Amino acid sequence: MSHHSETILTAILNTKYLENGSKHKIIELPKTNIKKLIKDFLSVNSNKKIQSDCVLINYFPNALLLDNPNKNSSVKKEQTNQVKIIEKPITNNINKPEDIWDIIDNMDKENNSESLENIQSENSENNDNFTDNNTKKSPTKSRICSGCGSKGTLLEDQSSSVLVCSECGMINDDLLDHGPEWRQYYNDDGRGEGVNRCGCPSNFFFPKSSQGTILAGTGSGRLKRKQKWNSTVYKERSLNDVFEKISTICSKSNIPRIIADTAKILYKKLSDCKHKSGNNVGKQIIIRGHNRISIIAACIYKACEMNKNPRTVKEIARFFGIDEKKVTKGNKQFEKIMKNTDDNMIILDPVNSNSTEDYIRRHCPRLKVNKDHTDIAVKISNNCCRMKLASDHNPQSIAAGAILVMVVFCELNIDKRKISRLFGISDVTIDKIYKKIAPYAPALVDDGATDHLINKLKING
């Protein structure tokens, strides 16, 4: 190290110690005046039109730590007096400057070492837990050999399906394979029949046909189907025909699948009902002929009500291509059989099974009415039922009248004929309900106003 660089380094270190109030010992300055050297250097480079700060930074990287020459003279005298207080110089690391990058590298190394130690400790803990869990789960680790009495020496021989001791070679127990017999890749091997050796699971709709194991033949597919149907119970064969008819009608009429499944369950439970009185006590109720079609239509009608997606009798009759009277007759017969069934066999919710809200929420999207206006129509219909303004009409007619009141109240451009055609109700019926509801429309829109009218008029008591 040259004399000039050593002088600059010593001055910078002393100034830093004094500013930070460090307890390090002050290093003795060389006899050469550092400030005079810097002034000489700046005077030499001033002709080159270079800024003094840039020159200092380029040639003396730590020169900014020195005192500013513009400071008060009193502060300079105090600092020079402090520098003159000399103790014994520190012999260690005088010639080595403190590099900030070395400090950062050392800190990174310490952090990396700490993280590695943490990872190693976590891995060791996980390994210990894994071994503990294995010893708890595996029964062979804790079992004792019946031949030599050693513990933890039993091994599972999968090829022979036995539990063998690794010390004495004695067979202690047999093993059972709880996995599948073999895997089936959905007949990708080209074989027509399946390779499973067990039958299908029990079916709620066909309990008798799902029992036992069906052995498939090697003939053509048509013979297999005949063999399958010949082995099926007659009653379940007729049930399958009914279920196919329900599925076909629901799919053609855009009825959701959940309604079709509910209708199948209702028909299945009705077919299992038995007579409770008369000459046929204990015998199952037989449903056949035209009576069966009416019962199927009634099951779909009830399933729509149970799933809050009601259909009118006229719609159900149109789906099946039968008269409305047959649908009504089927509903009456359905209720009659339901009364004669065992307790809790068929559970129907008589309350709110067919409400005005269900009809409104079903038909408003077809009228291109948004959700806010739909909620207003629902509120009008509910408050109308609470005030008993149109109690002599069915829910479908009240829903149509509530939609018409909402259209007039909100000033929407929807024709009354379109509502009557969509609901299947005459214009006269809608006009009757409208005249009953329209005078109370401002109150029916607000639940608080409706409550006030109910209390004032004492409608509910």
UniProtKB/Swiss-Prot annotation:
Residues 113-142 are annotated as: Disordered. Zn(2+) binds at C145, C165, C168. It holds the Pfam family Zn_Ribbon_TF. Keywords: Metal-binding, Repeat, Transcription, Transcription regulation, Zinc, Zinc-finger. GO terms for biological process: transcription preinitiation complex assembly. Residues 121-137 have a biased composition (Low complexity). A zinc finger (TFIIB-type) spans 141-173. Sequence repeats lie at residues 246-327, 360-430. GO terms for cellular component: transcription preinitiation complex. One of its GO terms (molecular function) is TBP-class protein binding. InterPro entries: Cyclin-like_sf, TFIIB, TFIIB_cyclin, Znf_TFIIB. Belongs to the TFIIB family. This is Putative transcription initiation factor IIB-like protein. The lineage of its organism: Viruses, Varidnaviria, Bamfordvirae, Nucleocytoviricota, Megaviricetes.
